[in-house]
Design a protein with these regions (language model features):
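Glycine-rich phosphate/adenosyl-contacting loop at the front of the ribokinase-like
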Residues: 1-70, 74, 92
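A glycine-rich helix N-cap at a beta->alpha junction
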Residues: 71-86
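Short glycine/proline- and charge-enriched loop/turn segments
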Residues: 20-28, 184, 239-243
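Conserved phosphate-binding/catalytic region of the ribokinase-like
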Residues: 3, 198-310
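Conserved phosphate/ATP/ADP-binding segment of small-molecule kinases
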Residues: 148, 152-157, 162-238
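Conserved phosphate-binding/catalytic loop of the ribokinase/pfkB sugar-kinase fold
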Residues: 84, 94-132, 137
Length: 310
């Protein structure tokens, strides 16, 4: 059944300045609207590596919601478990500076409580034959509990990302039950109540290794933008993954692509450093385009001997 991805759908509204960006001032520019959401992007990224994920989510009961389903289905994502409900999609509004980085953002989260009922009713058929599970840690607590319960029942690996760290902090205890957790440097600082922005990769790696050991977190990967990423396991394994050197067009979705690549690697037999390397390549492919998902790849390009199913 492939990798099961569980999370919210957002509509991303992105503003780009046409000339030098003036904080607090009026800026002429262009505005784009695209389908987004961490796990929606992750599902499409996995599908773009010619794997066939299943996306469990909610969309609005409108034409916009149907558009999301249609686009994912076109990319060969299994959309059987996407339900249409009122207020099923969130909105993410972001303004970018001249370097392609987000300088201001506001998000309105959707109501994801119906996911708990969906997993209660159909959890067995969703998870029994899947290859692995990827989800957003900032879903409702009952939803997270349901995912972890099913993962334990069917002995499936579970991987988590986040879109809102303040909400995810309330789920911190669940990290001990997750096979690998991926976040960025700023989010890691919030998670461990510390300041990491000044740290170089080597220092960040040592700090992360100490933190995952003391917090009993099985495995964690922290992305550091242009400086790459660091990883650490509670058993002492740790390392640095350098970033790929590319021209930055738009950083939206790069973290999601990194997470997708890491999940793909860990699910299909790669070591943690090899999985992070796949994540780094997918992230680079997103950064150098205006899209928020990666272009098409084949599994063999990442050393994955998985048949492509059409």
């Amino acid at each position: 059944m492939g990798i099961v991805v569980i999370g919210a759908v957002f509509v991303d509204i992105k503003g780009y300045p046409l000339s030098t960006y003036i904080p607090g001032g009026r800026n002429a520019g262009r505005v784009e609207q695209v389908h987004g959401g961490v796990c929606r992007n992750v599902a499409e990224d996995i599908a773009n590596v010619e794997l066939r994920p299943t996306f469990v989510s909610l969309v609005d009961d409108t034409g916009s919601g149907q558009d999301v389903i249609d686009k994912l289905a076109k990319h060969k994502v299994n959309t059987k478990y996407i339900e249409k409900v009122p207020d099923g999609m969130g909105t993410w509004l972001a303004v970018f500076d001249n370097n392609g980085d987000v300088c201001a953002a506001i998000s309105k989260r959707p109501d994801t409580t119906p996911l708990t009922r969906l997993l209660e009713e159909k959890g067995d058929e969703i998870f029994a034959d899947c290859d692995g599970i990827a989800f957003e840690l900032d879903l409702e607590k009952d939803t997270v509990k349901q995912i972890l319960r099913c993962a334990k029942k069917y002995n499936k690996k579970v991987y988590a990302a986040i879109s809102n760290m303040s909400i995810a902090m309330e789920r911190r205890a669940f990290l001990q039950e997750i096979d690998c957790f991926v976040c960025n440097q700023q989010e890691a600082g919030l998670l461990f109540s510390d300041e990491y922005d000044h740290m170089a990769p080597e220092e960040m790696c040592r700090t992360l290794a100490a933190n995952v050991h003391s917090a009993n977190i099985p495995c964690m990967v922290v992305t550091m933008g242009g400086e790459g990423a660091v990883y650490a396991r509670s058993n002492g394994e740790s390392g640095v993954v350098p970033a790929k050197k590319v021209d930055v067009i738009d950083t939206t979705g790069a973290g999601d692509a990194f997470f997708a690549g890491t999940v793909i690697g860990l699910t299909y037999g790669k070591t943690l450093p090899e999985a992070c390397e796949i994540g780094s390549r997918l992230a680079a492919s997103v950064i150098c385009t205006a899209e928020n998902v990666c272009p098409r790849f084949r599994p063999l390009e990442f050393g994955l001997n998985i048949p492509v199913v059409d």
